[in-house]
Amino acid sequence: MLRYTLTEQLIHGMEVSNLAYDLARELGYEKEICYELAKAGVLHDIGKVVLENYVEEQDTLVVEEMRFVRTHPTLGYELLQGRGYSDFVLESILYHHENYDGTGYPANLAGEKIPFGARILRICDVYCALTSDRPYRSAFTQEQAMELMAEEVKNFDLKMFLAFQRVIHSGSRKAIELSDVDELIREIIKEKTENGIKEETGYRNERYFTERNGNP
């Protein structure tokens, strides 16, 4: 059975957010674009919250988990529409699983046809996934993760990947404030609590976000 806890999505989202901001800055994008990428980073997997609810409601249904996993970018895109986020943020989220060689999803876009925000998120998302513990494996070290990504570099924009290597080894990264995203996350926590789906770690979810981004 699939399970995506809100705690896991918050932590992963913040890690991707900060890396996306730093990578955009390393690539020379203006501050506003870097900030927009930080928003997209923290929300890029928000569709998994919807996915969790759907799968948990289908307790007796046998599902092909990968098929459902691959719907999360579209679910996230749809969830965030009408909430005041820019087209840039929404498209970055929708296409963050597209591979540079055209083998990704949901639209099999390739090369420059993939929005540059999505290309940035792709790199940061993969790195954060590799350097995090999973039920079936321990986290890879920074060096191991970069080696694995280099072996699959066809999936990434090469210029961005080289810039990402510089970011990872710079040692000058720091967390940034995203107060409007903070409010959305709090809304989702509130909705899940009211619907009786609150995790036992729910309080720590909010505390983690507040500590990393300042008081609301």
Language-model region placement:
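Short, low-complexity N-terminal regulatory "tails/caps" that precede and couple sensory modules
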Residues: N215-P216
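Histidine- and acidic-residue-rich, metal-dependent catalytic cores
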Residues: M1-R212
